[in-house]
C-alpha cells in the first residue's frame, strides 16, 4: 500500500517517500512531511546548485551548504537559485 503524506512543500496530500532520504533529524522530517514529487523537484534543484557552484561533494563545506539548502527548500524561504536559470514556460 502506498504511504501518503500531507506534503509541506506542495501543500497537498501526495505519495510519500519509501524511506528517509538523509540521515538524522532532517531526513526524518523530510520522510514524514515531503512527497516523492517534491523530493524529485529538490533533486533537480540540487543538481543545478552543484553544477552552477562547482561544488565538490568531498568538501565538508559543500555538503553543509547543500544540507542548509535542502532545509530551506522544504521548510524555509526556498533554496538559492542557480544564477542565470530561467524556468521553462508553462503551456
From Swiss-Prot:
Task: Quote any Pfam family the record assigns.
Answer: Iron_traffic
Q: Which HAMAP family match?
A: Fe_traffic_YggX
Name the GO cellular-component terms: cytosol
Protein role:
Could be a mediator in iron transactions between iron acquisition and iron-requiring processes, such as synthesis and/or repair of Fe-S clusters in biosynthetic enzymes.
Query: What Gene3D superfamilies does the record point to?
Result: Fe(II) trafficking protein YggX
Q: Which family does it belong to?
A: Belongs to the Fe(2+)-trafficking protein family.
Q: Which InterPro entries match?
A: Fe_traffick_prot_YggX, Fe_traffick_prot_YggX_sf
Keywords, in A-Z order: Iron
Task: Provide a Gene Ontology MF annotation, just one.
Answer: iron ion binding
What's the protein called, per UniProt?
Answer: Probable Fe(2+)-trafficking protein
Q: Which GO terms describe its biological process?
A: cellular response to oxidative stress
Q: Which top-level group of life is the source organism from?
A: Bacteria
